A protein has these predicted regions:
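C-terminal beta-signal and adjacent terminal beta-strands/loops
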Residues: 615-616, 743-751, 772-828
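Transmembrane beta-barrel wall of Gram-negative outer-membrane proteins
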Residues: 150-305, 309-323, 327-328, 503, ...
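N-terminal periplasmic "start-of-domain" segments of outer-membrane beta-barrel proteins
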Residues: 1-27, 54, 83-89, 139
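Short acidic/polar hinge/loop motifs at secondary-structure boundaries
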Residues: 77-112
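Extracytoplasmic beta-strand/coil segments of soluble accessory domains associated
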Residues: 8, 16, 36-81
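Gram-negative outer-membrane beta-barrel transporters
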Residues: 397, 499, 611-753
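N-terminal periplasmic accessory domains that precede
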Residues: 34-35, 39, 58-60, 73, ...
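Outer-membrane beta-barrel transmembrane domain signature of Gram-negative proteins
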Residues: 299-301, 307-320, 329, 340, ...
């Protein structure tokens, strides 16, 4: 909470969780994101299949607010953002926490309070600080392997950590992680009457294409529809295939008694792939086309059963930070640092076509890359003044300069180019009066079935442009958005009396692309006794729109009412979005209130903290504006004209337009309760009981109806459970540790505008069990299961589980079932 002076959890004026490496090791996950989800109930994390890049970099939330409202630090220094801007919802762009191997961590500090006045943009919901290991000796290696009870999703992770001395007074600590995970599928066959017919007219639709199904033609085409997955399901819903190699280092060298040089950084490479929506025979993408020789071509020649595009994402992440810290003779402490970081996503789309190119279309495309880069230089100082208070007054102050950029890199030509079939009669076979031209008569003479008088003839068929599922970034919309910012900040704190601690912070930050922001914070703790204290804070905060949110553009497949349509996202400051009413993005601003208490009652440690966050001018994507080439479709046709006039390639294949906007005001309020209690059983060992319980409620504080439809409004407030709890019992006896953990997810609801129906999801408990045994000083084994009772959330029943989907796949509840694992660790 206070710069320059560490404080314990119980005497901090704001709520802080500190998890040691032992705490992290007691969690069965190795992914740092999942570890946080397990330990911090106000940290929610879902899995989003068929969601473009969000399938590979999972956005999270803290205290009911998206991931970009939480500041991420490594060794108390700002972590760079990922290159992913989530297209829907809040358009969140935060750091990719999964690039930090859990074995590299000495501890994790979670500040559950606004801290923009101390750390700058993004620290609205809180701050997560990852502290790296700094041992100068020792070697540890572990291998973890497991599989879901459904028989899929096999995962293997190998981690290692090595500590070495650096000269006579330094260290270098190196961590590595290599992992591989197979895909899962929690789907039923995607089968509808218009493409999965039942010749007997009697079988239920869900067995028409099963092992005993009756549609032989559909079954015969399945192997070509979905490459790389179970060919019996044309559209799998589950986690993607994934593999990764990640490395982190942390180093320090004591130059003299008062001066230390330090550095840390990482390299991470990962690749994932998952499916998109199934294009069934008869879908608008799969149409008869009249080719240049007068013959008819249909994509079913390449894909007899239709096709499911396969989306690949290669994610590269790099960072390097160096600095020097120490103290001057006058007692002024300093810390000078510089950092650079970059995240890049390279996309590949396979098992698809550019429909407008007809028979000439390739089947695999490189639609382009996304790159986020940051460079920052910072100077921190702190000084203690003697005072008449119970402690010296600590003054911390400093300055920062940061450059940021976001680049959309052009895709390969065929991923975005408009082929001949983007326009009717591309080869000039027919006259305006619907008679054959000379070219038309020539192909008819050669045996073509061309009939210019028939409006249904394939010569007039128009199909979509670009690699279907994720059209490439064209030169027109491939650009680099850059900005810089400077900041000045100060923080003062002191124990006013033996019982009262007060802290104040002030920050001024100026951005090159919008006006400056000034934010403040006040916090305090009053200790009534050694065992009981109250604490609270009030502060203002802000989150600057990222260069990615301001500059990104994307056209991808969405499913607003159960059917795939191409949806275009355009920059709020660009001409297309502004023609529809958009204005350039401005910072989100916030006011945070927290009040709570800490208590130590006998062996019981208890903290209770109430909070409220008011967020003004929240960044959100508008509800999709329909687009149609039909002149009778009113506003939808006007939107098409705007796109077409702006020169958007393939405007005729776009079904909707959205953009980010500062749309409305929201609030997030709740309570966090954390408790622990140890039990000693003498010769029978000891048990530590812990509980972390979180309640969160979100609400709109201004009318969002101009930007969000009824379903989006309902889901924003109700989609995630209000209550979430984690209850853990860890029993140690001799060399054996037994851990039982129960995770609770409260009742919640979701709606579907296509059916105007709402579904209540019942409360759900997941139970994890694990046993660890220390074989000797070197080897330790562990085995157990997550969700051992194989619980699932309720199946969807309001019409938004189209296309073989059984569960609300965007839910924060896991829907993959039970997972069983074993782990071997060696410490040298």
């Amino acid at each position: 909470g206070a710069r320059g002076r560490p404080r314990t959890v119980s005497d901090s004026p704001v709520p802080i969780d500190v998890f040691t490496s032992e705490d992290l090791r007691a969690v069965s996950y190795t992914d740092t994101n999942d570890i946080l989800k397990t330990l911090v109930p106000s940290f929610n994390l879902g899995r989003q299949p068929i969601s473009d890049g969000s399938s590979f970099i999972r956005p999270a939330e803290l205290r009911g607010l998206p991931t970009d409202k939480t500041l991420v630090l490594v060794n108390s220094k700002r972590r760079h953002r990922s290159a992913l801007v989530s297209i829907g919802g809040s358009g969140t762009q935060g750091p990719d926490i999964s690039t930090i191997p859990s074995i590299a961590l000495k501890n994790i500090e979670v500040l559950r309070d606004g801290a923009s006045a101390q750390y700058g943009s993004d620290a609205i919901a809180g701050v997560i600080n990852f502290i790296l290991k700094d041992a100068d000796d020792g070697f540890s290696v572990s291998i973890d392997s497991g599989e879901f009870s459904e028989g899929d999703g096999a995962q293997t992770t190998v981690q290692a950590n090595l500590g070495l001395p650096l000269g006579e007074s330094g260290f270098i600590n190196i961590s590595a992680e290599i992992s591989e995970a197979d895909a899962t599928s929690r789907s039923e066959q995607y089968c509808e009457s218009w493409f999965c017919a039942d010749p007997n007219g009697a079988s239920p639709y869900n067995i028409r294409s099963g092992q005993n199904g009756g549609d032989a033609a559909f079954l015969a085409g399945l192997p070509s529809a979905n490459i790389g997955q179970d060919s019996a399901v044309v559209q799998p819903w589950g986690q993607p295939n994934a593999e990764a190699a990640r490395f982190f280092f942390n180093a320090g060298y004591q130059i003299d008694a008062d001066t230390e040089a330090y550095a840390f950084g990482n390299i991470s490479e990962s690749e994932s792939d998952g499916g998109f929506f199934y294009r069934y025979p008869g879908n608008g993408t799969i149409e008869d086309l009249r080719e240049s020789d007068g013959g008819i071509y249909n994509p079913l020649e390449k894909y007899p059963g239709g096709f499911t595009p396969r989306f690949f994402g290669e994610v590269s992440d790099f960072s390097l930070l160096g600095g020097i810290r120490g103290s001057f003779d006058n007692g002024l402490n300093y810390d000078f640092s510089g950092r650079t970081g970059e995240s890049e996503i390279r996309y590949t789309l396979a098992n698809t076509i550019n429909p407008s190119q007809g028979r000439a279309s390739q089947q695999s495309f490189k639609p382009g890359d996304l790159i986020n880069s940051e460079t920052q230089f910072q100077a921190d100082f702190n000084y203690e003044f003697e005072s008449s208070f119970a402690s010296p007054v600590l003054l911390a102050f400093g300055a920062s300069y940061m450059d940021e950029s976001y680049e959309v890199v052009q895709g390969e030509l065929n991923s975005y180019v408009a082929g001949p079939h983007a326009t009717p009669d591309p080869f000039g076979f027919c006259n305006a009066d619907m008679t054959a031209t000379t070219a038309g008569m020539n192909v008819i003479a050669g045996g073509s079935t061309l009939d210019c008088a028939n409006t249904d003839d394939p010569v007039y068929q128009v199909v979509g442009v670009g690699s279907n599922g994720f059209p490439g970034f064209s030169p027109q919309f491939s650009e680099k958005y850059e900005r810089s910012s400077t900041a000045l900040f100060a923080d003062v704190s002191a124990d006013i009396t033996d019982n009262l601690f007060l802290q104040g912070a002030l920050r001024y930050e100026d951005y090159s692309d919008f006006d400056a922001e000034t934010v403040v914070k006040l916090a305090g703790l009053y200790r009534f006794t050694d065992n009981f204290a109250i604490r609270g804070s009030i502060g203002t905060g802000f989150r600057a729109p990222t260069p990615g949110q301001q500059g990104t553009i994307n056209v991808s497949t969405r499913l607003p009412n159960g059917f795939p349509v191409a949806t275009g996202l355009f920059p709020a400051g660009g001409p297309v979005a502004q023609a529809l009413g958009a204005t350039p993005l401005t910072p989100e601003t916030s006011t945070n209130y927290t009040i709570g208490f800490t208590a130590n009652i006998a062996e019981l440690d208890l903290t209770v903290d109430f909070y409220r966050i008011n967020l003004d001018d929240a960044t959100y994507a508008i509800s999709t504006r329909d687009v149609s080439t039909d002149p009778t479709s009113g506003d939808a046709y006007q939107n098409f004209l705007l796109l077409d006039n702006a020169g958007v390639a393939g405007a005729n294949s776009i079904g909707g337009v959205l953009y980010f906007t500062n749309g409305f005001d929201v609030s997030s309020e709740g309570v966090d309760i954390v408790a622990s209690y140890p039990l000693n059983w003498d010769s029978a060992g000891s048990t530590n009981l812990s509980m972390a319980l979180s309640y969160n409620k979100k609400a709109f504080e201004s009318d969002p109806s101009a930007f969000r439809n009824e379903e989006a409004q309902f889901d924003y407030v109700n989609y995630n459970p209000n209550w979430r709890g984690v209850f853990t019992a860890a029993h140690d006896i001799n060399d054996l540790r037994l851990t039982a953990r129960a995770s609770y997810w409260g009742e919640h609801e979701n709606a579907n505008s296509g059916t105007s129906r709402r579904q209540v999801q019942d409360p759900t408990w997941y139970v994890d069990l694990e046993a660890q045994y220390q074989i000797n000083d070197t080897f330790r084994i562990a085995a157990g299961g997550r969700n051992v009772f194989d619980e699932y959330p309720d199946k969807g029943n309001v019409g938004d589980t189209c296309c073989g989907r059984l569960y609300e796949s965007g839910s924060v509840l896991d829907w993959n079932g039970s997972y069983w694992f074993a782990r071997l660790t060696a410490d040298f």
